[in-house]
From Swiss-Prot:
<keyword id="KW-0546">Nucleotide metabolism</keyword>
<comment type="similarity">
    <text>Belongs to the HAM1 NTPase family.</text>
</comment>
<dbReference type="GO" id="GO:0036222">
    <property type="term" value="F:XTP diphosphatase activity"/>
</dbReference>
<dbReference type="GO" id="GO:0000166">
    <property type="term" value="F:nucleotide binding"/>
</dbReference>
<feature type="binding site">
    <location>
        <position position="48"/>
    </location>
    <ligand>
        <name>Mg(2+)</name>
    </ligand>
</feature>
<feature type="binding site">
    <location>
        <begin position="77"/>
        <end position="78"/>
    </location>
    <ligand>
        <name>ITP</name>
    </ligand>
</feature>
<feature type="binding site">
    <location>
        <begin position="20"/>
        <end position="25"/>
    </location>
    <ligand>
        <name>ITP</name>
    </ligand>
</feature>
<dbReference type="GO" id="GO:0036220">
    <property type="term" value="F:ITP diphosphatase activity"/>
</dbReference>
<comment type="subunit">
    <text>Homodimer.</text>
</comment>
<keyword id="KW-0479">Metal-binding</keyword>
<keyword id="KW-0547">Nucleotide-binding</keyword>
<comment type="function">
    <text>Pyrophosphatase that hydrolyzes non-canonical purine nucleotides such as inosine triphosphate (ITP), deoxyinosine triphosphate (dITP) or xanthosine 5'-triphosphate (XTP) to their respective monophosphate derivatives. The enzyme does not distinguish between the deoxy- and ribose forms. Probably excludes non-canonical purines from RNA and DNA precursor pools, thus preventing their incorporation into RNA and DNA and avoiding chromosomal lesions.</text>
</comment>
<dbReference type="InterPro" id="IPR029001">
    <property type="entry name" value="ITPase-like_fam"/>
</dbReference>
<feature type="binding site">
    <location>
        <begin position="182"/>
        <end position="183"/>
    </location>
    <ligand>
        <name>ITP</name>
    </ligand>
</feature>
<feature type="binding site">
    <location>
        <position position="94"/>
    </location>
    <ligand>
        <name>ITP</name>
    </ligand>
</feature>
<dbReference type="InterPro" id="IPR002637">
    <property type="entry name" value="RdgB/HAM1"/>
</dbReference>
<dbReference type="GO" id="GO:0005737">
    <property type="term" value="C:cytoplasm"/>
</dbReference>
Length: 196
């Protein structure tokens, strides 16, 4: 989904401000864009609208961040959607995770026949209020029976992507996760759009 047009060419002369307070996200984004664009990081306490759409949430945060910073920003929102729960917790997964942790997320599926789920990530690049571009990455997989792995962050220990050779994101090396995660896929789409 794109509005307007934007120019972002790969070189250290071009920069974008990643708006996140999550060090794990920051590391993943910098690893994926390294050598293409200078990524600066700033933590802003942005209001997050309540919506079932990660596109809408990410867009709103990007426009708000741009209004504060007044230079190109990159903002991200993610969702973890359980088939058995009609897509919940979806974009609310951060708050679910903070309240009930990984074991609580797993328990949400007790009594259901399916553990299928998908993770999605939407990056919004905003160069002005008229230039807003969005890039999505998605991974299908399943919610495991017990948390597995020590790496990653957030819900990485409960989601086993179909592409993950039987491992959760928390069990993978960073290089592997950065190749198949929804965040990585969204960044690949961003790089392709800008010919990076």
């Amino acid at each position: 989904m794109a509005e307007g047009s934007a120019v972002l060419r790969g070189s250290s002369n071009h920069k974008v401000t990643l708006v996140t307070g999550n060090d794990g996200k920051r590391r993943e984004v910098q690893a994926c864009l390294e050598g293409h664009v200078l990524v600066e990081n700033v933590k802003l306490d942005l209001p997050e609208i309540q919506s079932d759409s990660v596109f809408e949430i990410s867009r709103n945060k990007a426009l708000t961040a741009y209004d504060i910073i007044k230079s190109p920003v990159l903002v991200e929102d993610t969702a973890l959607c359980f088939d058995a729960l009609g897509g919940l917790p979806g974009p609310y997964v951060k708050w679910f995770f903070e309240r009930i942790g990984p074991t609580g997320l797993i328990k949400l599926l007790e009594g259901f026949d399916t553990r299928r789920a998908y993770a999605t990530c939407v990056f919004t690049y905003c160069a002005s209020p008229d230039v807003v571009l969005q890039f999505e990455g998605r991974c299908d997989g399943r919610i495991v029976e017990v948390p597995r792995g020590e790496g990653g962050f957030g819900w990485d220990s409960v989601f086993e992507p179909d592409e993950g050779c039987g491992q959760t994101y928390a069990e993978m090396q960073d290089e592997e996760k950065n190749r198949i995660s929804p965040r990585a896929k969204a960044l690949v789409a961003l790089k392709a759009h800008f010919c990076l």
